[in-house]
Amino acid sequence: MASALGAQASVAAPIGAGGYGRSSSSKGSNTVNFCNKSWIGTTLAWESKALKSRHMNKIFSMSVQQASKSKVAVKPLELDNAKEPPLNLYKPKEPYTATIVSVERLVGPKAPGETCHIVIDHGGNVPYWEGQSYGVIPPGENPKKPGSPNTVRLYSIASTRYGDSFDGKTASLCVRRAVYYDPETGKEDPTKKGICSNFLCDSKPGDKVQITGPSGKIMLLPEDDPNATHIMIATGTGVAPYRGYLRRMFMEDVPSFKFGGLAWLFLGVANTDSLLYDEEFTNYLQQYPDNFRYDKALSREQKNKNGGKMYVQDKIEEYSDEIFKLLDGGAHIYFCGLKGMMPGIQDTLKRVAEQRGESWEQKLSQLKKNKQWHVEVY
């Protein structure tokens, strides 16, 4: 997920709003002071294995095959002791200089556009929680404000607090390269490309990157009930925070968090080649069939019940009875992705509610009151 600072979430509240805290079960007595920037995580004595993606020789921190056999030990466990999430440790005027570890293409050749998985080394100095965002300041001068640095762009973090290396020293971003094509000529106009996304996707290992944050509370994964149900709805790179949730639930061995509930992911993309982290998610489906469900809406390959393109709201309608029953039982529902996805989803939910003899306005109000409704769109 990416957005300009100040235009991050446009539905219920800004990303940092809502006062949505976190309480974790079985927390230790020691507390990490997130306000102290000198805190550095303990080095993890565990070497990760390589995973080749279905599209190219892409290296991740461990293999899906290993994850299927046993969960991965993570360190430092003190990252789970804090009672409140870290917030705005680094601000735009004083960003933290991190280092690019790797940049890998996530999508196949038939995907419209390019999406990259970018691992950043912050040395344990910019800790975060699942569901938060980093700000990135691309190098150069703001074209609209000569003499000023470029505007901060916010990206949802696509890893757990322990990072893809499981040592608390890295964070991963899921970034779609923003390009502009002239509607008349059909040719790409490099002068109008996304400054930050292209900087990140063009980065090389060892390059420096200025980051701010972490920011955001509304998409934090509530952990007070380890048996809760979480319904996650995403389009494209909106899947980023959910990857962090799911790795925490199913991949990592965190003594203070043992997930026993249901995680249900709905992902909408153009086609099969556009699927993001599909191999990871499919592995969870195979290994935890009682705790994970995974439904895809491929708009260029699938048809909805009316013969039109299959969008994520069509999948929601298909399973609407189950979804509403789960919400009535206290399930959390999350939306992350393009701002344009929300009107169609809201219309679908309203129509389904009316068919059930319910008022969607009242139901939505109750979901927000109960802190079951989480939205981050851009």
Curated annotation (Swiss-Prot):
NADP(+) binds at S156, R176, T237, V269, A270, S299, R300, K309, G337, L338, E376. GO terms for cellular component: chloroplast; organelle membrane. Its cofactor is FAD. Coiled coil: none annotated. The keyword Transcription regulation does not apply. InterPro entries: FAD-bd_FR_type, Flavoprot_Pyr_Nucl_cyt_Rdtase, FNR, FNR_nucleotide-bd, FNR_plant_Cyanobacteria, OxRdtase_FAD/NAD-bd, Riboflavin_synthase-like_b-brl. Belongs to the ferredoxin--NADP reductase type 1 family. This is Ferredoxin--NADP reductase, embryo isozyme, chloroplastic. It comes from Oryza sativa subsp. japonica (Rice). The lineage of its organism: Eukaryota, Viridiplantae, Streptophyta, Embryophyta, Tracheophyta.
